[in-house]
UniProtKB/Swiss-Prot annotation:
This is Basic phospholipase A2 homolog 2. Gene3D superfamilies: Phospholipase A2 domain. SUPFAM superfamilies: Phospholipase A2, PLA2. The keyword Cytoplasm does not apply. GO terms for cellular component: extracellular region. It comes from Bothrops brazili (Brazil's lancehead).
Length: 121
């Protein structure tokens, strides 16, 4: 669910997920689409592609189980789609943490109409 994704992002980056990534670049947030502006935006692009491959669950609403052990996200789910959704969310949270040094405040509220068409997933 979006709540769980936000919690993972907060745990990994220490940033408020809605304020920091809700409208970042061309791909972060609900309306995201377009050629990534930087490494952080690319994390969101890859995340959208990851979620597009899912079948049998709703990435926005369906909840999955995961735990936070030794500062590591551990997905624990028997349902294959929910396990994959958890892994997609885990990957983007880690990617955002790994690219904190390239986070650019000028892309925090980037206007989506200015985004160029992205390559298909």
């Amino acid at each position: 669910s979006l709540f769980q994704l936000g919690k993972m992002i907060l745990q990994e980056t220490g940033k408020n997920p809605a304020a920091s990534y809700g409208a970042y670049g061309c791909n972060c947030g609900v309306l995201g689409r377009g050629k990534p502006k930087d490494a952080t935006d690319r994390c969101c692009y890859v995340h959208k592609c990851c979620k597009k491959k899912l079948t049998g669950c709703d990435p926005k609403k369906d909840r999955y189980s995961y735990s936070w052990k030794d500062k590591t996200i551990v997905c624990g789910e028997n349902n294959p789609c929910l396990k994959e959704l958890c892994e997609c969310d885990k990957a983007v949270a880690i990617c955002l943490r790994e690219n904190l040094n390239t986070y650019n405040k000028k892309y925090r509220y980037h206007l989506k109409p200015f985004c160029k068409k992205a390559d298909p997933c």
